Amino acid sequence: GNLSQAAAAQHAYRQAQDARQRMGMLVQSLSDSQVTDIVSVGIGGSDLGPRLVVDALDAIDSRFRVHFISNVDGAAAQRVLSALDPQRTAAIVISKTFTTQETLANAEAAKAWLQAALPGDGMTNHFIGVTAAPEKAEAFGCGRTFAFRDWVGGRYSLWSAVSLSCAVALGPDVFEAMLAGAREMDAHFVSTPLERNAPVLMALAQVFNVDGLHRPARTVAPYAHTLR
């Protein structure tokens, strides 16, 4: 019923707030450490959203460099890892189910690379999981895990713990400002009359182009190279 849905929503909200707080603590911990490089391992929505944000805001001064690994052929992981120092690197493995084969293959490579230089508990702050199945991430060897709900779709996952690499790269102030912008857009969609509602108008324009004008193709032309 509605009560159970409301309770579930409250639980999800508290979980998200807890994740944000823990993300902030990790960012501070990494900032106080010798880590300078972040390796983000994921595919699809677990890779594209964070990659977009880091690329788009690359002008922001940050002590951290973020490297993305999504290709499963092995060469990409080898190329990234061979140029880094494991003592100064933290790997973030992002997978909703923690069963995605492409992601786990690259995660295994990153884990073996880190373990060779950081035996025992040395990997706690260097091998981090972001997932809707935290028990699987822990079993895989992640020293820290950040959870999100399994109903969070890939195209929306940027607004969850999936954006951990963004929080590290951008710093807490810029990251919180980005989330505030998302909240403003949510509020606009919920409260603005339809005739002035930007997402609704964009959707209606697309429907008209396809069904009315029979033009199914759509061009997205970024005004800045970093938004490509």
Where are these predicted regions, by residue range?
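Extended, charge-enriched "interface" segments that sit outside catalytic cores
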Residues: 1-32, 36
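Glycine-rich phosphate/diphosphate-binding loops that line cofactor/substrate pockets in enzymes
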Residues: 25-36, 80-89, 205-214
